[in-house]
Amino acid sequence: DMISILNRYGMKATFNLNAGRIANQPQRVQFEDFEEVYHGHEIASHTFTHPHLNNLDLGGIAYQVVKDRELLEEVVQKPVQGFAYPYGLKQEFPDMVNCLKCCGLRYARTIRNSHRFTLPEDFLRWDPTCHHEDPEFDQLADKFFKPDDLEHPWRIKLKLFYIWGHSREFNGNWELLDRICQRLANKDIVWYATNGQIVDYVSAFYALRRSVNGKFIYNPTDVDLYVCVNKQNIVLEKGKITILE
């Protein structure tokens, strides 16, 4: 099935779940199976019952997010701070996104395929690269894995290939997922990460402190960060000051 294929290829996924629909739908992964099934992946919110957010006022949106978070967090025993818009972010109204932030969410994914590899300017309006059934997937993969980039890693700009979809859309055609994973897996130059891991990593970069002359960088976080300076890959070790030559 989906997760066994992802695990076989070392891929990482974020699963956006509606806590209010799980108990009444036995075909879904049940709460008691979360730890075993989703181990190594991320659990994120998708609202409590999957309503159209545009049909709700801000209080209704807050309820859907907070209730979903509360139940999911009770199961996974850690903060759930990610989100995917049910039916996508189609018609944003004033304060909708700010409401999500006030509910403790750090990022929210849309369904607008960008066909780009850039990090989002706003993680609460995070457009993915493509859907798993996108007819341009192979061309996008070719563009992402440019041979010259692999031979000259200092030329690489930070890129993110973000694929989204629904498990039901595979309709049992797990050969498609297997082909996608084969195409993307086992690249030494790629970090395979969940949404939350990406947000944490980018947030850690924003926390770096540089000296006026740029020679000294202090990493106050608990994450090792990687940069390229003068064609040299450098690790900014967590909790330490790095001197750049």
Outline where the language-model segments fall.
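Short, well-ordered alpha-helical microsegments
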Residues: 1, 91-94, 226
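Alpha-helical packing segments of well-folded alpha/beta enzyme cores
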Residues: 2, 64-72, 176, 180
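N-terminal carbohydrate-binding/catalytic regions of secreted carbohydrate-active enzymes
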Residues: 2-5, 22
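A short, Lys/Arg-enriched amphipathic alpha-helix followed by its capping loop at the start of a domain
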Residues: 4-11, 183
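Metal-dependent polysaccharide deacetylase catalytic core of the NodB/CE4 family, i.e.
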Residues: 9-96, 101-106, 110-130, 159-167
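C-terminal domain-boundary segment and adjacent tail
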Residues: 17, 21-23, 73, 107-118, ...
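A polyampholytic, Gly/Pro-enriched intrinsically disordered region
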Residues: 129-139, 210-217
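A short, acidic, amphipathic alpha-helical segment used as a generic capping/interface helix at domain edges
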Residues: 137-154, 206
